[in-house]
């Protein structure tokens, strides 16, 4: 993902990422808004962090900068489309990840690796089985990502005007990212619960409405947010590791910190993979909270798992330390292309918006 060097802002100022939202999206958003909206609003990002790029008037529009007239709607649409595409393309791998994180899987659902799991699911359960629950994921990802972008962009500018008038504030970036993540995860968490229950082996749910109705009637509305705090807790270390790894790799692959798509994709993908592997224990706990495997764990616990602490204890009681890293392979494999997909979509929108704006200006 495009996490160009921003001094301290590249790490501390980046927005946090959610489960249904890759860290690459958040990183690219930070770089995108700082380059585009920050300049349009009077922020001096380029002068503060790196020398301005001199552009030949005949070379066409500046590919790195959004037009000054970019609106909140632009960020909402770009975020929604990128989020939906990312989740849809990688959904089969996400299904495999969820199953591999099961603490006590059915003998027919024990997989050695991602490819074997995907092949067996298709062969024994049907071609479209890995896609079950995709509709609720896409429905949740669109509004969640749009809300994230709109909140981050608006709050970042508002706080920057208060903290550092006329410039860019890393504190404002961090605060805006935290608030945006709270809203994003609040919108996405119910969809995550339904999606993961439909992904499990022998899931009794074939339709989203059946799953929603059963969860509501049997466990109450709170079940849709049982993993919310765990999700938020996972995002903080995930984002920190992601940015630190990215900056380290950029120092080697792109020491001049110029616009270099290949270095951004490679660094972002590697950083996402490292962060995904490191935070897998929290993801396992989140999956347990969402799927509520207590029915299969009656020999160890009674009742529902109510929070992150009880989820951590249950995972250890059932599978030991190694259980915290169930599905790590699938999680890493999912994260690498997800980062590239999100980055590519944002770059496409950025280029398209800039090109059309320049064409409109030229035609005036």
From Swiss-Prot:
Keywords: Ion transport, Iron, Iron transport, Membrane, Mitochondrion, Mitochondrion inner membrane, Repeat, Transmembrane, Transmembrane helix, Transport. One of its GO terms (cellular component) is mitochondrial inner membrane. GO terms for biological process: iron import into the mitochondrion. Residues 1-17 have a biased composition (Gly residues). Residues 1-28, 40-60 are annotated as: Disordered. SUPFAM superfamilies: Mitochondrial carrier. Solcar repeats lie at residues 70-158, 168-252, 259-352. The chain crosses the membrane at residues 72-91, 133-152, 170-189, 227-246, 261-280, 327-346. GO terms for molecular function: ferrous iron transmembrane transporter activity. The keyword Membrane applies. It catalyses: Fe(2+)(in) = Fe(2+)(out). InterPro entries: Mitochondrial_sb/sol_carrier, Mt_carrier_dom_sf. It comes from the Eukaryota. Residues 18-27 have a biased composition (Low complexity). Belongs to the mitochondrial carrier (TC 2.A.29) family. PANTHER family: MITOFERRIN-1-RELATED, MITOFERRIN-2. This is Mitoferrin-2. It comes from Homo sapiens (Human). The gene is SLC25A28.
